[in-house]
Amino acid sequence: MPVRGVLFDKDGTLIDLQASWVGAGLATARHLCALAQAPHRFDELVRDAGYDACAARLDPRSTWACGTTEALVREWVSRLALSGGEALVMRMVASMTAQAGATVVPLADPAALFARLAARGLRVGVATMDLEVGARMALQRLGVLDVVDFVCGCDSGHGEKPGPGMVLAFCRACALEPAQVMVVGDTPHDMQMARAAGAGVAVAVTSGAASAAVLAALCDRVIGDIGELEPFLQHHALWPAPSRTCA
């Protein structure tokens, strides 16, 4: 069945994970350690959260890579026994989201890719475990917000990855069947979300948190980055006939 909609993950798929969320997370952890007057705990905190400083990579199954910013910050605040409660957590979530959104380094060329997909009649969506406002900020910086048909974050009311809700919401927004949707992402949770929703095609990229070895068993195809997506669509005759109608 031809693909009629492509739902992309954001971090590690469209933008450089290291430049955005890793940098913002390290800064947040350092700040929290300073608040706790425990700078010596920084290395332990980020290591236990899934960051390998020697390899400069995140564990692809960690909360930092797959979960929400709020869950990560809550874990750190709890481990450091910081006072401040909900106000501190929300303040640090907002700060980390803003830092990540201010450092947007595109992977391949999302703007050109999205324009070509739209010209072919495909609906384009972005589903992220970031807050929706953070996602929209990043997409604006990439210059693609105006051509994206659907954006959702962990707070948009469609559940979280690896559940099917984000894919199904994309389908509802664009009058698609799950079998007509290709999901593109860089983590096991992205691929598991695709399977849970019954998406037609699950494509993993190795430009983010996970290696091909981790992703291969969970998806239909592993590619290096989104720059290889169009040749894959062409080779497997997944392009639809040109048309662009969506409710």
Residue ranges and their predicted role:
Residues 1-6, 19, 34, 111-119, ...:
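Asp-based, Mg2+/Mn2+-dependent phosphohydrolase catalytic module
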Residues 3-111, 116-120:
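N-terminal helical cap/lid subdomain that shapes the substrate entry/recognition surface
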Residues 13, 128-130:
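Conserved phosphate-coupling serine/threonine residues in phosphotransfer and NTP-handling enzymes
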Residues 64, 105-106, 127, 158-159, ...:
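Residues that cap or flank secondary-structure elements
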